[in-house]
Amino acid sequence: MPAPTTRTVEVPGAVLTYDVREPSTAGPHRPLLVFGSPMAADGFAQLVPHLADRTVVTFDPRVSGRSVLEDGTGLSFEVHANDAHRVVEATGLGPVDVLASSGAAVVVLPWALAHADDLGTVVAHEPPLVDLLEDRDVVERLMADVADTYDARGHGAAMAKFVGLVVHEGPFPEDYLDRPDPDPADFGFSAEDDGRRDDALLGRNLRMPPYRPDGTALRASGVRILPAVGASSTGTMPHRGGLALATLLGVEPVTFPGDHGGFMAGDWAPDNDPAAFAARLRAVLEEA
């Protein structure tokens, strides 16, 4: 795949940076947008080379990477959705297929309602749709506690709590917050507070209002939305969110290899296989 072309687009309150990678040989496939929230484009660096048979667009959300946040107030899933729309509009490549990971798998839902013509097939991989969970009241308190911990004690203490939250299997008990705080060192984080409070996840996205999708409106949008889950993440909150979205839409969930970040491997997830993830993605898109 040739080197990407990198451009920017101005949106209300931010300047977004996006990349377009063209295939060496033009083919029949619809262009593919791959994005996360708040994960920046470089989080998909292991996946994108395995998608060289089609045009691939990636971008950094307004809170991440190379994008510039000019106004941090009023952040919401709907704001992120309009940003994604503006990126596709700027490329002139729509309609696009989409792989949306984690928070982006929530972002695509208001996007589908507002700009259905942008979208072909949408793979919504492990959306943390807290409002659809049976234990949503507990999870909302846990998310607020992580954000409050970040404000009070900084990155390491908050990330240790967040990681513990996202790897927990099954519904959260009412007394979960009564447990001792995790040691940041157990997760490879420093317990020292570096004084910064600009983390994209802990300082921005966790403070957004929860999003409750309208299943009737999404089904009527005409967008093919495929809720997806990781084969290795059964029982975790984002996996449960994917299953709940599938139930809401009346469709079967699609299983992908790996865990919540199955498109990238490393010391933290050596069994993830980006090539296998890409192969599954191509197969799902080509079933359309």
Regions found by a protein language model. Name each.
Residues R7-V68:
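Conserved HGGG/HGGXW glycine-rich cap/lid loop of the alpha/beta-hydrolase fold
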